[in-house]
Amino acid sequence: AFGHLFSRQLALVEHLGFVPKQSEDERDAMLVRLEYACQTNDFRKPSGAPLLDLAMAMKEHPLSLLGPSEMQPVLIRFKNQLNENSGRFARIGVVPEMNHNELVAWGGVSDDADPAREDQATLFLTWDGLQKRVSSRIDWMIEHMPTDYAWRIHGEGTSLLEVLLHHCIVMDWLTIALAFLHGKDPAAIRPIQALKAYLADEASV
């Protein structure tokens, strides 16, 4: 569903001129690179072993997702995929805004911090196009993170669009791996189905 909806929305915003339109060669090259990312992050293959190791390290910890404002769409999607695929809660923080408040709860240079901060599994979503000051903020946070469970996931690509899609591929494999580690079918969405059935019954009254 994601690919079906996204491709049509992308075609529309390109047609309206909201984002630069890619040439056929650029689009084809991007799709080749994204297909490679899809294949190499498959945790059923040897190349996907690092992703599976990451999922195993995340399994027993509360999850935090942090990144710059331009990564906010994939931060939200990542949280949603963890909720739906893995049956896990996750929260997101956007840099630099979270540096003005949430940073206090992380501590790192002070004891005035959340008691559970050291148990957080934290993923930083980054890319080559990070604004310099934002990059410095993230580097400072990584250096002062009070948890041993912190990783940087770097989006690959020659454009922001490609980087966002690359992050989506990695998060899909990661949340599916985490689902299996928890013994959950990543396609199982019984609470959503139950809610829809309840609303349908209520509407028919």
Residue spans of the language-model regions?
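A SIS-like phosphosugar-recognition module
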Residues: A1-V205
